[in-house]
Amino acid sequence: MRILITGFDPFGGERVNPALEAVKLLPDEIGAHKIDKLEIPTVFHKSKDVILSQMKRYEYDIVLAIGQAGGRYELTPERVGINVDDARIADNEGNQPIDEVIQVDGNAAYFSNLPVKRITEAIKAQGIPSRLSNTAGTFVCNHILYQLGYLQATAFPKIKFGFIHVPFVPEQVTDKPEKPSMSLETIRIGLYAALEAIVESGEDIKVALGETH
C-alpha cells in the first residue's frame, strides 16, 4: 500500500502551519506501507494541481490531506467536502472566491471514503482530543477535500481519500490567548494513530459520533 499525506504551507499571516510541520515529522513507512509527504500551497485550484501531479507519478491507495483549523482544540477528521468556495480571507496568491462552484460537473458534496469514525476513536485512544467534523469550512481545506472526492469519482476510482484538521500550536497563540493550541508532538502522535487505523482496516465502525447542531 502506498500513502500520500499532504500539508499546507502557512497562510493568513501565520509563520508556520502545524499541519505541514506535523506531516514532516511522520515516518516514511508504517508497517510495510510507504508514506510520501507533500507540501501543497494554500491556493485554490493550484493545491489540487500539485496533488494531481504527484498522483500521476505514483499509484496511491490512500491520499490524506492535513490542514490547520485555528480555534479548534481537537484533531478533527472531516466527513464531507462541499462544492463551494466562499473565502472569508484571500488565499496565498490573493484569490478570494465568493460563492463559486469548485467543479461545475461535480456532485454537491463528496464524502470521505476513509473510516472516519475509526480514525477519530483511534486518536482518542491515545489520550488526544478528537471529534468527527461535519464541516471543513469553505476555504482551501474544504476545497482540497472536495477536489480529492472529485478526482476519486472521475479519474482515480481505487483511491481512499480524506482530510484531518489540526489545531494551532502554542507558538501561534502567544498573541491569541483565547485560542486553544496543541503541541506539535501531540499532533504527530494523533496523525500516526490515524494512519494506523487506516491501514488496519478500511471498514468503519458503528459508533454514535454525530452532532445535534
From Swiss-Prot:
It is found in: Cytoplasm. The active site is at residues 78, 141, 165. Its main location: cytoplasm. Disulfide bonds: none annotated. It catalyses: Release of an N-terminal pyroglutamyl group from a polypeptide, the second amino acid generally not being Pro. The keyword Cytoplasm applies. Pfam families: Peptidase_C15. Keywords: Cytoplasm, Hydrolase, Protease, Thiol protease. GO terms for biological process: proteolysis. SUPFAM superfamilies: Pyrrolidone carboxyl peptidase (pyroglutamate aminopeptidase) (SSF53182). InterPro entries: Peptidase_C15, Peptidase_C15-like, Peptidase_C15-like_sf, PGP-I_bact-type, PGPEP1_Cys_AS, PGPEP1_Glu_AS. Its EC number is 3.4.19.3. Belongs to the peptidase C15 family. Homotetramer. PANTHER family: PROTEASE FAMILY C15 PYROGLUTAMYL-PEPTIDASE I-RELATED, PYROGLUTAMYL-PEPTIDASE I. Removes 5-oxoproline from various penultimate amino acid residues except L-proline. This is Pyrrolidone-carboxylate peptidase. It comes from Staphylococcus saprophyticus subsp. saprophyticus (strain ATCC 15305 / DSM 20229 / NCIMB 8711 / NCTC 7292 / S-41). The gene is pcp.
